[in-house]
Design a protein with these regions (language model features):
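Extreme N-terminal basic, low-complexity initiation segments
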Residues: 1-12
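N-terminal polybasic/positive-inside topogenic patches
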Residues: 15-23
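N-terminal catalytic or cofactor-binding beta/alpha core of small enzyme domains
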Residues: 25-193, 198-268, 274-319
Length: 319
């Protein structure tokens, strides 16, 4: 069963339409669905690019039938409804790239080499692959296990299917991010990728003050993917709205920011993790009372980053 991505747009929001990348239709032929939605103007008006890699909900029947677990279990891997949180930021000019494929099919926040070779039939050559705690824990490029539920797949993934997922989903997504960031850098002098994720509820995160756990985590891989002043701008914007923040703990940023963040070239990358209790209902399935507030949070962070980015070329010129 497929669930098309819906964009949460209150009545006062401008009506946004996804701009699809991909081949055009010719002579009545239907073009294949692109691996992502692109939201934003064809000619970017902001140096901020948003990435939402874990909110895809296009569960192909073939994928669901290949799983030994029900679709509801596969959905627990999602960053639930994070795609619907970015409408205010895109209405303000940011460009967003939103994955269509669910994380269960392929994890866009993993290196394409970060996979258990035994998951593929015939097995991939071990040389050149990246083995990590994530692959050993079943959450590599293609997730293989869900904690508490066991193995996901009835059989190993064929090499042809593995190559299809990498070639038609993973690589095009990252190529699109790279192109958008480079375009923004050339046009504005600097660019930033804000990689948007959500995390399981943290005890105390719904509270305020020093005793409350941080509900918004920013990650720049310990200062390697963005400048300190940009991180400070994001933190300041979130705290101004009353959110408690932390940096790099427990989430320092994943493959997306590591791959695309090149501060020395004027391309920065910052991960934001949002406690799901902030914006979902008690069942963590549907929008909750705080949903619109988190939409405003992301927009405020994106705007603060944009303002600081636009100052960077002037600062360099003044040196």
């Amino acid at each position: 069963m497929r669930e098309e991505i819906g964009f949460f747009q209150p009545r006062d929001a401008p009506r946004l339409r996804p701009s699809h990348s991909g081949p055009s239709c010719r002579q009545g032929m239907t073009a294949p669905a692109p691996p992502f939605f692109r939201i934003g103007p064809a000619r970017p008006v902001s140096p901020v690019v948003l990435s939402i890699p874990h909110a895809g909900r296009d569960y192909r029947p073939e994928l669901v039938s290949a799983a030994r677990l029900p679709q509801a279990a596969l959905e627990t891997l999602e960053d639930r409804l994070v795609d619907r949180l970015v409408w205010r930021a895109t209405a303000n000019g940011a460009t967003a790239f939103i994955a269509r494929a669910p994380r269960a099919e392929i994890d866009l926040n993993r290196d394409e080499r970060e996979i258990d070779p035994a998951l593929i039939a015939p097995p991939l050559p071990a040389g050149g692959l990246v083995q990590s705690a994530r692959t050993r824990g079943g959450i590599g490029l293609i997730p293989s296990r869900i904690t508490g539920l066991g193995p996901i797949w009835r059989e190993r993934v064929t090499r042809a299917e593995f190559d299809r997922r990498v070639g038609t989903i993973h690589r095009p997504y990252h190529a699109a991010l790279e192109a958008a960031l480079e375009y923004a850098r050339v046009r504005f002098g600097a660019a930033l990728l804000l990689d948007c994720h959500s995390m399981p509820p943290r005890p105390g995160a719904a509270g305020h003050g020093e005793a409350a756990a941080a509900s918004v985590i920013f990650g720049d891989r310990h200062g390697t993917t963005t400048s300190a002043d940009l991180l400070d701008a994001a933190v300041t914007a979130a705290r101004a709205l009353g959110y408690r923040t932390a940096c790099n703990a427990p989430y320092a940023g994943g493959y997306v920011v590591a791959r695309h963040g090149r501060p020395q070239r004027g391309i920065h990358a910052l991960q934001i993790e949002l406690d799901r209790a902030l914006y979902l209902d008690a069942d963590l399935r549907a929008p909750g009372p705080g949903f619109e507030g988190v939409c405003r949070l992301i927009a405020a962070v994106a705007r603060a980053l944009e303002e600081r980015l636009l100052e960077i070329p002037d600062a360099i010129a003044a040196e």
